[in-house]
Amino acid sequence: MDRIRLIASDLDATLLDAHSQLPPDFVPTVKALAALDIHFAAASGRPLYTLEEMFPALRREMILIGDNGGAVRWNGETLFTSEMPPEGWRTLARKTRQAGDVAVLCGLETAYVERQYQQYDAVMKQFYTRVDYVDDLTAVTAPADKFTIYLPRGNAQEAFDALYGPACGAEFSVAVAGKNWVDIMNPGVHKGAALAALGQKLDIPAGSMMAFGDTYNDAEMLETARYGFLVENGSLPLRQRVPFLAPPHWEQGVMQVLKQLLAQGGAVCPEDFRPAH
């Protein structure tokens, strides 16, 4: 049996429901995990300031992994940030503008979007509770840990394959984040690296880690934890890369596994779960 001590979960299309809402019993579940000395981390492409506003009742219990691993905060202390070089993201901004896509510079305190794309404000505010609209993104001087591209037509995978992967993959960490987003971070920055760093800091081995996700920006995280779960609604090719499947997010699949873990006192073995392949 393995005793789980650290759990990380993606949010959109994983922990959250179809309306981007948390399960109603999420807060008491995390508190019950904490009582068993099990840490819970929200691992998201959203920034830290948005995550803090999402979990006001769990600021002491939860670890926050923001911007796909670009920043980590626990109990009010920022443990890690990976600031992108300005010359790098300015080049990305020009490339995105030429392609006709929407660039989002993820600053540590706010997101920056060019004013010509203010029509997408409702979409931006779903993920970035602070957005500053500027005339020219390349003129921004604030530190940033992620550069995100919004694809309104839902063609993120195609844009990644044709343009952003080949053009940026050698210099940056690039990942598709659902149908509408491509995320770009410093090389080596992803949710899996953040989870591994947390494991080192807390002295928790991979065999005592559990993780949940649905798409490609979760892949390394699901491979880092021994108990990595792809929710059933997740990207099909990832089933070959992860050990286990959880029920889909609309059935609160993450919560089903967490409740099973609690019922077993925090101890599990691989035979307890449905294999992904």
Regions found by a protein language model. Give the residues of each.
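Conserved acidic, metal-coordinating active-site core of Asp-based
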Residues: 95, 99-221, 233
